């Protein structure tokens, strides 16, 4: 299995782990605090802003640990640049990530059209974010394995 | 009616590496400016390189693009 394939699997697992744990924590807090309509937007804005920081730090740590583990286990160094194959696959992965997020956004808006509670809007947008990252990692894995 | 499916393009990269002093995939990758994984994908016919990369690979073997890459006529 190539470096890029392993990297895609690590990205997939870490996305599911970080987003899943943080999502679980936020929904647990939401149920504990039960914010009213006035506090609802503030609650989700704070939750999403904190998540951006948490996700950034977690991704940096995972990248550093993954590279160190890859070097130690395989005795090889990771590619230092992205070539035309990486860029082609990267573009397709980004396209699919946008599709997944756009679909999630439409579903999020539909929750309000169907008069579901506001929490459904934020929860769906959060899930759309996870779906887009999963779509990106899966697309990369698929094209690195099957070819372009 | 004209076929619009993907053309199958074979290649002689592995053979040419062997004939050029058993050049490694990494050596070829360094010569043409891509990662070793890209050479692996090209050899396995999982990736058809850009025209620019095809010329660089041919030049690395001191040959022509037609000697390295072969169009499978049955896929036309």
Question: For the regions a protein language model found, what residue spans apply to each?
Answer:
Chain A
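Cytosolic-side membrane-entry/anchor segment at the start of a transmembrane helix
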Residues: 1-31, 138-148
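Hydrophobic residues within the alpha-helical transmembrane core of Major Facilitator Superfamily
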Residues: 20, 61, 103-110, 138
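Membrane-interface helix termini and inter-helical loops of multi-pass transporters
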Residues: 28-41
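Alpha-helical transmembrane segments
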Residues: 42-62, 127-129
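Membrane-water interface of transmembrane alpha-helices
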Residues: 58-76
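Short membrane-interface loop/juxtamembrane segments of multi-pass integral membrane proteins
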Residues: 77-97
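Alpha-helical transmembrane segments and their membrane-interface junctions
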Residues: 98-118
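Alpha-helical transmembrane segments and their immediate juxtamembrane interface regions
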Residues: 121-148
């Amino acid at each position: 299995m190539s470096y890029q394939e392993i990297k895609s699997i690590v990205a997939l697992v870490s996305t599911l782990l970080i987003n899943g744990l943080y999502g679980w924590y936020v929904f647990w807090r939401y149920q504990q605090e039960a914010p009213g309509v006035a506090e609802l937007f503030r609650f989700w804005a704070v939750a999403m802003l904190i998540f951006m920081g948490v996700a950034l730090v977690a991704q940096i740590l995972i990248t550093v640990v993954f590279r160190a583990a890859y070097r130690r286990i395989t005795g090889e160094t990771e590619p230092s640049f992205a070539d035309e194959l990486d860029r082609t696959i990267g573009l397709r992965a980004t396209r699919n990530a946008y599709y997944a997020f756009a679909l999630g956004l439409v579903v999020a808006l539909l929750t309000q059209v169907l008069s579901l509670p506001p929490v459904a809007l934020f929860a769906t947008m959060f899930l759309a974010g996870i779906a887009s990252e999963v779509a990106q990692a899966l697309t990369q894995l698929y094209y690195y394995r099957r070819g372009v | 009616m004209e076929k619009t499916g993907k053309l199958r393009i074979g290649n002689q990269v592995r053979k040419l590496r062997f004939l050029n002093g058993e050049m490694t995939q990494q050596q070829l990758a360094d010569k043409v400016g891509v990662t070793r994984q890209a050479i692996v994908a090209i050899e396995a016919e999982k990736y058809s390189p850009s025209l620019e990369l095809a010329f660089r690979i041919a030049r690395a073997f001191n040959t022509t693009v037609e000697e390295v890459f072969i169009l499978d006529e049955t896929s036309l």
